[in-house]
Amino acid sequence: LALECFRIPHFYRAFYVYKYATGLSAAIALSQRVLTGGADELADYLGFLQGGCSEDPLDLLRNAGVDMEQPQAVDTALAHFGHLVDQLDDLL
């Protein structure tokens, strides 16, 4: 039991949890583009999916309209989270 913490990769793998946050930020930014955009944004998203592993993930995301090297994707995710918190607050 004393070494139980070594079984959980969240504690010892560099950037393990960071991957969740960046993936979620990218997904929210992509979905917001599709839901609020038009045919071009949908085509960008489908192109992202069709890209598979053909390019670097950052390049695929950038081509789909989400630049993970800029703060907008994280800002979009934080705004979405804030909206969800407001909805929860209204329910409570």
What are these model-predicted stretches?
Residues 1-92:
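C-terminal, non-catalytic "cap/extension" segments appended to globular domains
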